[in-house]
Every structure is written in C-alpha cells, then in structure tokens.
C-alpha cells in the first residue's frame, strides 16, 4: 500500500479464482485503498466485497475524468459482480438515408456507421424505426430495396403499384424529382416537419385549384402519412431540440431507469432499463453509475435531463463532454417543460417497474411449478429451447432461445447454420444432433463444467439446467447419447415435447429419460409456460431461416466472384447497369472500369463462362 501513488486511477478487485469482483475509480488511489483497508464504516455490500477480495490491480491515469471513462469501459467489458451493470445494452437503431447513389434508399440501421449517408436517431426500438420508415415511404415514396435488387429491376415492383415507392429503378420518376423527395424526407427528419407539411398543403391546394384532383389526392395522402408519424411520437416538446431524459425508480429491491430520446424537437421513443445493482444502493448512486456507462458506445446529445442529482455530477458532465467532443449539459430541471418531460419519464419508470415486479413474481412461480412437474431438484435458472427450420432441407438453420427468472434472455439467443453435408434434406434428427454437439462443445470449451458457477450466484448461468427439444423418446435418447459422449449427460436435464394428436395445442406429450411419456392438464399454467417457450423458439428459428433465405434470394451473382468487393461491384453495376450485362461483357470491356485489372477482368469473364 505504501507504494501506491496519490494519483487518480482505476482499480480492480479479484477473488481467489481470479474473477473480477469490482471495478472502481478514485481521485487518489492510495487514499481509496487505505479506506478499504480500515474495514470500518462500510455497508454490508462493501464488507462482503472486501471479504472476498484477495488481490487488486491498478491503472494510473492523468486525470479523474480519464479514470471515469476507463472505469465505464472496464465495467461494460468485465461485468464485475459488485458493480451496477446495464442488462440490456443492445445498440440503438437509426434511420439511414443512403448517399453516393443516384436514388438514395431509406433503411433501418444498427451498429457502426460504415455506410455513406445521413443517419437519424437514435430510436428507442426497431418497432419505432419500422413504423417511421413505413409512414415515410407513403409520404415521400422512397425506395427500400437493396442496391443489388435496384440495379437488376426491369419493371416497377408491387410497392410502386400500391403507391409506396416512386420506382426510380425504372425511371418512373426523374432523378431530379426523386432528389426533391429525398430532400423533403431529410428536412422532415431534421426537425423541419412543419415547413414540409406547409409545402405539401400548398401543393395540394394548387393542384385542387387547377382541377388536378388526382395529384391533389396524392399530396393529401402524403400529408396524412406525416401526421400519422407525429401522432405516434406522443410528446413533442417546443423548447427542447435535442436531449435524453433519464428517470429512476426503485421498489422491491429492483431498479428501473426510463430513457426518452428527443431529437430535432421530436420524440423518438423510450426504453426501460433494469440495471443489476445491490439493493443497498440509492437512486443517486445507481443513476450516476448507469449514466457513466450508457454513452460508452453511443452518441451523447447536448442536453441530458435527470430525475435525480447524481454523485459526482460535474465529473460525469466533464467525462460526457470529453467523449462526445462537444459541451454536454447535465441537469435536474425544477420547472417548465423540461420538468414535465422528466415527470413523464418518471411515471413510465414506475409503471414499467410495477409490471416487471409482477412478471418476475409470476415467472418464479412458473419455474418452481416446472421443477415440481418434471422432478427437478430446484427451480431452473436457465432453460434452453431448441428448434430447426428449413424448406425441404434448404437454408437449414437451428435456433436456441433462453429463458430464466426474469423471462426471455434475448442476448443469449443463438443461431446455427447447418453445416453438415451428409445430412439428408429434411433430416430434423440429424440437424438437431449437429446443433446440440456444436452448442455443448463450445460451452465446455469456454466455461468448463457448471461447478465453477456456484461461486457467483448473482450471475446469469452459462450452463442450462434444462433443455427442451421438439420430439419424442428418440430425440431425447439421441440428445442424451450426445451429452454422454461428451461426459456431461448428468449435468443437464433433457425434455422432449411431442405435438399432440392432430398437432393440437394442449395435447402435447412429454418425454424424459427413465420416465413414461405423460401429458399435463389442459389448463395447467406450466403447460402454457412450456407452450410459450416452444412458440418463441419456433418464431426465432423461422425468423432466422427467412433472413437466410432472403439473403440467398437477393444475392448478386457478382458476390460469388473472389476479389469483387462493394467498390468494384458498384463500379461494374454503374457502368453496365445489371449483373446480366456484366456477364455478357468481353474482357476488353471489363478492363475499361477503374479498379479492374486484366487478371480480374478474365476472372469475371471466366466465372460466367464456366457456369
């Protein structure tokens, strides 16, 4: 301890197994560790943490702000047991208006901003983005097809017929007029909604005055679509241009933080978070820790409104400003419209936490009921459900969904593209065998056996207590055999669900090792629970299969050629128009394109001639 510096920095506390218990930051590392060492005046949580700590590691930083940023990054990456943890850290969706194309498209986008274009967001959910894009299609008639589909169209698609697209692909609209629609969409998404609506209203009146009622009806429908967007946005504040609103509510040992997003003066939705935090921590501590992590990989607006004054608020403000590259104001409003926004968020936080507490209580009863029904030693903490999806063996996929004490755990869902070439098309049995082998081989490799998880009871387990599979005694026996070959058959309970007579819900038969098949009473809550798990697995597997099939359908033939990336493909399609025209081109013609060497031109030419 004597060698510790009096500098700001970050410290990590480890238990006897090398697991990270806690990540913290300090203005003075020496004083902070000395405070821990005194062992008096600590809360029960801190006392437990110190008792389990056997070693510590330190990183000295230049400033306390730098320490706060590093701490947030390490907490999100290491997920220590005693820190406040964000449970749902899925990236936010955006609306993307693509650039670098004669006819920009409008798309939902999630993840890194690698594509050229204008991004609008964040939106709170994919559903909010979908509804907005749906309405914007009707209002501005922008395309939503991929570039590869766009380049190969020879006639307008159905969306043109139902007035959801202006068909720039086949020049049903001029590039100049389409650019005008794109500019209007950008203006609307940038907060100039009233000027766009005024322009459309004026155009409608002018068309009506000229007795051009057909065009007047088009403008009327576009205005209605924009009004539909705004009606779904709820509160649209007049004095708040860009802000995120955070409100926290604690009850029953749980915490809910409700976040509302306002951009360009419009409400772009909200999302409820239920961070993992010790029940001894108050709202100011939890909200401060949450805020430090929240913007680690997200853009921060100029204004952040809070329902509580958080610990080290000035330091957090400085850290957010540093990360965002612009000045960020963090405040707790006391009056006016901003106060109303916070109160609205707080009301939503209370309601969301109330629903969560009721759902958690119900889920606990169902898990206990499942344990009693199937003779399990305790209520399962992790259930995995498997299902396959394919059409005559093509684009075959397996899906795994996960459920626990708090419902479905979607960040644990997994997709499996069936790789085996020796599986007969439509062989569900063989597909399930591959999925189970791959899942548990990786589980053993990454986590060892379940014995190591007992030491951290607060963490969501990596190993399932129960796996549910679609099938009867044969499927259960096969799964048990696979697990037995891996030496883990005694660690997991496998349950088969066979559809009832005429595939009627409520008449399912259940199969377990060493037991006779049995059914459950039609109104048994456990039966409904299992049906819900099975239906979720089915939904997930079918969705995965459809996505893979769609990708196969829209795949451009140029994607099959080694060395043809997005840039070369775009250059070829820009010059020749379609992939079919590229396939007919001579080597000399291909060499005229920038970036296409003679060797590449011959590779393209030979690829299509060899087919």
Curated annotation (Swiss-Prot):
For this protein, the record's CDD domains field holds:
GIY-YIG_UvrC_Cho (cd10434)
**Chief place where the protein resides:** cytoplasm
Determine if Nucleotide-binding is one of this entry's keywords.
no
Q: Which PROSITE patterns match?
A: GIY_YIG, UVR, UVRC
Q: Name one Pfam family in it.
A: UvrC_RNaseH
User: What is the annotated role of this protein in its UniProt record?
Assistant: The UvrABC repair system catalyzes the recognition and processing of DNA lesions. UvrC both incises the 5' and 3' sides of the lesion. The N-terminal half is responsible for the 3' incision and the C-terminal half is responsible for the 5' incision.
Protein name (record): UvrABC system protein C
């Amino acid at each position: 301890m004597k060698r510790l510096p009096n500098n700001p920095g970050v410290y990590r506390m480890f238990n006897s197994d090398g697991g990270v218990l806690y990540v913290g930051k300090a203005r003075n590392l020496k004083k902070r560790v000395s405070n821990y060492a005194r062992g008096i005046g600590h809360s029960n949580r801190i006392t437990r943490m110190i008792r389990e700590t056997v070693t510590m590691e330190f990183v000295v930083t230049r400033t306390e702000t730098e320490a706060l940023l590093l701490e947030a990054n390490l907490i999100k990456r290491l997920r220590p047991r005693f820190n406040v943890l964000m449970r749902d850290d899925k990236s936010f969706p955006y609306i993307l208006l693509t650039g670098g194309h004669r006819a920009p498209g409008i798309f939902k986008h999630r993840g890194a901003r690698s594509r050229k274009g204008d991004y609008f967001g964040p939106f709170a959910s994919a559903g909010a983005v979908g509804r907005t894009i749906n309405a914007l299609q009707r209002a501005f008639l922008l395309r939503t097809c991929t570039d590869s589909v766009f380049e190969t169209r020879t006639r307008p698609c159905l969306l043109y017929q139902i007035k959801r697209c202006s068909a720039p692909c086949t020049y049903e609209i001029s590039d100049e007029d389409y650019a005008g629609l794109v500019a209007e969409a950008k203006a609307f998404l940038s907060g100039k909604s009233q000027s766009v609506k005024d322009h459309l209203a004026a155009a409608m009146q002018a068309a009506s005055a000229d007795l051009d009622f057909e065009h007047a009806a088009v403008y009327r429908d576009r205005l209605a679509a924009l009004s539909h967007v705004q009606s779904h946005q709820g509160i649209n504040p007049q004095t708040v241009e860009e802000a995120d609103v955070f409100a926290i509510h604690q009850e029953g040992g749980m915490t809910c933080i409700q976040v509302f997003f306002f951009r360009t003066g419009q409400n772009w939705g909200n999302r409820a978070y239920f961070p993992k935090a010790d029940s001894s921590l108050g709202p100011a501590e939890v909200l401060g820790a949450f805020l430090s992590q929240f913007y680690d990989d997200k853009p921060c607006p100029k204004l952040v409104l809070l329902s509580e004054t958080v610990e080290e608020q000035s330091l957090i403000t400085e850290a957010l400003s540093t990360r965002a590259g612009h000045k960020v104001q963090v405040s707790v409003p006391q009056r006016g419209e901003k106060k109303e926004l916070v109160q609205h968020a707080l009301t939503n936080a209370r309601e969301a936490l109330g629903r969560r507490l009721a759902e958690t209580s119900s889920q606990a009863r169902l898990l206990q009921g499942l344990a009693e029904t199937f003779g399990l030693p305790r209520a399962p903490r992790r259930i995995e459900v498997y299902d396959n999806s394919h059409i005559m063996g093509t684009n075959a996929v397996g899906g795994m969904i996960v459920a626990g004490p708090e419902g479905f755990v979607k960040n644990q869902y997994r997709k499996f593209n069936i790789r085996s070439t020796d599986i007969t098309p439509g062989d569900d049995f063989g597909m399930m065998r591959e999925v189970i082998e791959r899942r548990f081989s990786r589980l053993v490799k990454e986590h060892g056996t379940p014995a190591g998880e007992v030491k951290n009871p607060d963490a969501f387990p990596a190993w399932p207590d129960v796996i549910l599979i679609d099938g009867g005694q044969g499927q259960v026996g096969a799964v048990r055999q696979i697990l037995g070959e891996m030496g883990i058959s005694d660690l997991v309970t496998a349950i088969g669900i066979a559809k009832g007579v005429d595939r009627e819900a409520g008449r399912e038969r259940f199969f377990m090792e060493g037991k006779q098949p049995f059914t459950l009473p039609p109104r048994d809550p456990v039966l409904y629970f299992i049906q819900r798990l099975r239906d979720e697995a089915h939904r997930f597997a079918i969705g995965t299969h459809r996505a893979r099939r769609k990708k196969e359908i829209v795949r451009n033939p140029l994607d099959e050629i080694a060395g043809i990336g997005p840039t070369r493909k775009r250059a070829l399609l820009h010059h020749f128009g379609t992939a079919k025209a590229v396939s007919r081109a001579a080597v000399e013609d291909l060499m005229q394109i920038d970036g296409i060497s003679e060797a590449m031109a011959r590779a393209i030419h030979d690829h299509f001639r060899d087919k």
